[in-house]
Curated annotation (Swiss-Prot):
Zn(2+) 1 binds at residues 70, 72, 85, 88. NCBIfam families: rpoC_TIGR (TIGR02386). Binds 1 Mg(2+) ion per subunit. Mg(2+) binds at residues 460, 462, 464. Belongs to the RNA polymerase beta' chain family. One of its GO terms (cellular component) is DNA-directed RNA polymerase complex. It catalyses: RNA(n) + a ribonucleoside 5'-triphosphate = RNA(n+1) + diphosphate. This is DNA-directed RNA polymerase subunit beta'. The RNAP catalytic core consists of 2 alpha, 1 beta, 1 beta' and 1 omega subunit. When a sigma factor is associated with the core the holoenzyme is formed, which can initiate transcription.
Amino acid sequence: MKALLDLFKQVSQDEQFDAIKIGIASPEKIRSWSYGEVRKPETINYRTFKPERDGLFCSKIFGPIKDYECLCGKYKRLKHRGVICEKCGVEVTVAKVRRERMGHIELASPVAHIWFLKSLPSRLGMVLDMTLRDIERVLYFEAWCVIEPGMTPLKRGQIMSDDDFLAKTEEYGDDFRALMGAEAVRELLRTIDIDREVETLRGELKATSSEAKIKKISKRLKVLEGFQKSGIKAEWMVMEVLPVLPPDLRPLVPLDGGRFATSDLNDLYRRVINRNNRLKRLLELKAPEIILRNEKRMLQEAVDSLLDNGRRGKAMTGANKRQLKSLADMIKGKSGRFRQNLLGKRVDYSGRSVIVVGPQLKLHQCGLPKLMALELFKPFIFNRLEMMGLATTIKAAKKLVESQEPVVWDILEEVIREHPVMLNRAPTLHRLGIQAFEPVLIEGKAIQLHPLVCAAFNADFDGDQMAVHVPLSLEAQLEARTLMLASNNVLFPANGEPSIVPSQDIVLGLYYTTRERINGKGEGIFFTDVAEVQRAYDNGEVELQSRITVRLTEYERDDNGEFQPVLRRHETTVGRALLSEILPKGLPFTVLNKALKKKEISRLINQSFRRCGLRDTVIFADKLMQSGFRLATRGGISIAMGDMLIPKAKEGILAEASREVKEIDKQYSSGLVTSQERYNNVVDIWGKASDKVGKAMMEQLATEPVVNRHGEEVRQESFNSIYMMADSGARGSAAQIRQLAGMRGLMAKPDGSIIETPITANFREGLNVLQYFISTHGARKGLADTALKTANSGYLTRRLVDVTQDLVITEDDCGTTQGYAMKALVEGGEVIEPLRDRILGRVAAIDVVDPDTQETAIAAGTLLDEDLVDLIDRIGVDEVKVRTPLTCETRHGLCAHCYGRDLGRGSHVNVGEAVGVIAAQSIGEPGTQLTMRTFHIGGAASRSALASAVETKSTGKVGFASTMRYVTNAKGERVAISRSGELAIFDDNGRERERHKIPYGATVLVGDGEAVKAGTRLATWDPLTRPIVSEYGGAVRFENIEEGVTVAKQLDEITGLSTLVVITPKTRSGKTVTRPQIKLVNENGEDVKIAGTDHSVNISFPVGALITVRDGQQVAVGEVLARIPQESQKTRDITGGLPRVAELFEARSPKDAGMLADVTGTVSFGKDTKGKQRLVITDLEGVSHEFLIPKEKQVLVHDGQVVNKGEMIVDGPADPHDILRLQGIEKLATYIVDEVQDVYRLQGVKINDKHIEVIVRQMLRRVNIVDAGDTEFIPGEQVERSELLNENDRVTAEGKRPATYDNVLLGITKASLSTDSFISAASFQETTRVLTEAAIMGKRDDLRGLKENVIVGRLIPAGTGLAYHMARKDKEALEAAEREAARQLANPFEDAPVTVDADAPQSDAGQEGSAE
């Protein structure tokens, strides 16, 4: 009977668990796992191939080799199950146990575990409070360590060399005890009193105030508390018993030719056993100490390399000089256990093939080759054959299928019907990279794919391959059908735009059809309906592009929401009228009544989705595609040399540019400009010329002359093929056409600097050798970049996914009223992103109030859809406070309200949606489109910086922002002297229309409150130099301006003119050289003071400034004292593209970051120290704060200026950590979102803000404890925000003091590694370190994230899995409650206290359920 039960036990090994705990195994634990001791290094007998007894593959320890058969063959078959053979000692059972039974090795001398020794910071060192160097000396038998000092003056843990030891032994005899090796360390660990240590440390922590000490103590405290809480004993870090891995996990495989392939682990184990046995023998023989010492050291080294080869000393190598793979190597890295086998497995029931286009398919179908389908659906076919009685056994069914009988094909058709398959194209960069389709059987061997899903897969038909997977279980089929079917995924999750937008041929066909031609055949005819138009077109009476008038039926919804037909007359073209047939009900004809370019078609599909729903849109898109292909073919648009029209004006433009360049060269040789300015100007001239040629070419291409009905010549949009391809957005761009028919223009060298001689030819004219050579630079750099980019972009995506993988929508509403105020994004006076785009799909945090009537237009908590955003636009609200993931108060996960709309579905987000992963994919997916390079200012990048004036785009009133300060100079011009001055233009209602930054030193041409018309110049400035402007009048007095010390006379060799240039001061010994500066003196010879203070005006010059005034010269307010040439203002590299995004998400402080004021107060300068200047801010209480700033930095403030907290005081890029510290989370989020968006916008990639916000939320998930209050935390410790809030709630409920904390910004790599889940962190990076730390702390992983659950093989807690886990937990809680109730019913007369007691755990469980 027992055997029967055992049989059942073996089958159902389906344990449910909710958490995984990791710890350090005690020797007893290791022995309890073991089925016997491995005593011999032998593996298998080379003649019989049977395992040696007591060896590494011993059957007695690890189990039989064949199922139910002992080694000597005495017992065979099932009936002897469980018998232990008396001859060979092998238990008769399944051979599978060789994968799970472990053995052990009793070590003759204890051995320290290398992970706890060498993984930095060394855990052994922390517990013992010794340095790693000292512990190593003891462990590897180079020094003695005092264990018990007894009555001697020695200290416990003191290290002594051999000579010292002998001397001390002579002195004290055996009053003290000292040991060497792992025994010493184990003794020290065993005798340490952890509770007392923790108490002393806590006391020291309260008493000390030095930063370094606090850091050191709290680190050690953390480790010791880990031991204390987890109940792990410190001495277990030193091993007495070594577990042996089950043999089938380190197999020995016979190869043909009598050789064996073996796992490296066997070698490593062999070494350990050999050394251990030798040591045992030496101990029995009472060998001399020195031999034993050597043997013990070798044993320690052997165990080290088994656990982590190469971690210490030289790595052990096999016969072929290759490093052996140790246990640690098995789990870490890309090919380790985590990433190779647990997170990415190869899948059964899958196939791959080349894809070809299948334009006849519906959107939800794909063509599957018959042979592939036959192979993939085999089990289903077998089942069907048996059910129909065509085959009696599986074997027979197999035969039928293999001979491909006709009946098999019919059955295949049946089996495949309504059974979706999943198609995947690698690289799968976002969730649209895997979609489900209904298979349609086809001949041939290639998979057919619908053209419209190519955009989502990023596929083309130039040899791409795709993989097919079959969802087997009913649930899987259901999910594939409802969630993954291609026709259910028509929006990009990144931005909510349609993904099934036609491209290329389709666009060209639709565009050609919907263009209008002046005086086409049949122009001006009136038609009754579309059918009549069709007849006329078929008979050749009208042309496709002719303008006609036709009566069309449109459908509009009445009050009941029913469609009512409405007849209207439209002036349109033949093509558009014919297209109107496929328009879904509910869309007006006006959406089609224009030339359909790619953007228009995208908008059309978007409108259709919002108004007509998913089904109609999919059908509409399919029909659009069919029409597009058909019409493109009928249009017969081709491409020819003659289409590339070279502009007539080209020669003139080039001649003019050459003349200007000669002029600049002349100025340079006469010394009016510097060489850098000459280069900048030349590049600028050619850039402008290139643009002019391009413009002339486009103008010539874009229109053509034509005679209209009245015989007049007019110009119409051209029907030139190349122009139509570019204009429709089908293929190519103006820039590419410019290279074909205009001029190629300026080329860059590989380092990014621009070659100043442009390529004046185009591809139609052909390039000469020099021009061709110049252009190869760019092409090769492009190829190299692409290869780098792909790897970098993939790594960025991996880090992003890792940091956000546990973020899931877990509840509907967290109930917060927090949120961020959203405004339209304005840059350089242009609205880059209107307010409607930024708030679409968000939830209003507070009521939106109509500014005119002051009534609530939209209540708080409403999801803002298209109609509501239009309403907000109409009533003229310019700021809306919306909920955001950053202010969500859900502890684990996010709430649906703070997230808003699920962009991939177009509706409110569901609970269980894995929004973290979606955000990571949305940001990572376009990564390959971003550039890799860092720009140098100069060349192309500086061309964008060469704006020299700003004009208003709208009519209104000028308003100066509060930051705007200016002085009026002698000519009556206003000169801006503020660093961050801004001008705004307000319309009649006082709403801000645009806003412009005015740089320092610009001439402002309008006054505050002045009315201006659109196109008015607001300000001008010199783009190539930056002036230093005087704010006061007076006579100049030079200070520290000594030639050869602080300034140099710069003689231009060519011109012979000299200027004073500020240089880095040469320090003479003993003399401190201060900065060159000037003071202003009034008529009486006194210093001019800053208004309202007694500070005198002093203006200091940065290095590289050209001083334009002379000593003693009278200057007026607003006059230029010096100019800083733009290039000497340190050409800062602008990091662009992918590296910039990575930099932002890794929260790196920029190299020469700008400085923000820590406090609000008045600026003054203290005494300069070597190479640094001292800047002092005195706050409102009179406390002064000092900052040391390197001399070469540009200080943006002057003596006596008042600055606000968080304002820039030293020029340079902002440091995100400073922004968080001084301006708070909201400012930081805005900064990161805007900066990331800038990079993507430059490439024309749209990503919704909330994806970036989700990542920022994860970067802010840890906090730094400032004051622990009455909580269990240690000051300076970093903890998970949710953990801290829970603990604070608990403490506050008990009426104690909660902990106070600072926000911490972690980079995505750091944040992933600091997650609470050790499984997730270990599978990401630094596996060894993560596991070591987790084991000491006895960490418990609650399997909250997706990654942990994938690794342990459970359903992920997202989507359908979340519901499954929640239901399971509720059920368990319910069952526990029922058991409890039943128990109480069984013995109702127990005394009261017990029942109360029994109630407690149940309520506890209830709470746990709710907390989840």
